[in-house]
Amino acid sequence: DGAVDALVHTARRTGFRGRWEQVSENPRVICDIGHNEHGLKYNFTQLKRMLESGEISKLIVLYGSVADKDVDAAVRLFPDNATYIFTRAQGKRAMPAEEVRGKYLALCAEDGRPVAQTYCCETVADAGRLAYQLVESCEKAGALPADVLIYVGGSTYVVSEFLAIKA
């Protein structure tokens, strides 16, 4: 289909990065700059399907947002069976990681959802290091690196900082 082809090849054609971009295979790392409810709904639906199908056994979400986005709507879309690392990008518009975590915990309490394992990191670099440490812990517990997925998203700024660290 033409739309799928356009999305898949956008990065190569334009140099534009961060749209469902797999930046690593072992462990698998996918970055996506989707930051509104529509984009995040698509992303989190894909991640839920990957977990449910057994394509991955462990999901680690590295997530940050800017303060003017509807984080309450975003956290409603989060998969229940993931580990969350909340972070903030550099810049004045970034929402503090603890505030994003607080919104997630409030939603869980309000909706009776199970609370996932959560962490907060003040920088994207620290969040990235923690994500890779969690992958190592999964491997020590018997998971294969290909069974673990790190998803980086919530903000163009978070993805950009992560990609700069990976470069």
Residue ranges and their predicted role:
Residues Q46, M50, L77, K103-E110, ...:
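Alpha-helical structural signal in soluble globular domains
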Residues L47-L51, A131, V135-E139, K166:
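Short, hydrophobic alpha-helical segments
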Residues L40-K41, V71-A73, P96-A97, E161-A164:
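Short glycine-/acidic-enriched loop or helix-start segments at secondary-structure transitions
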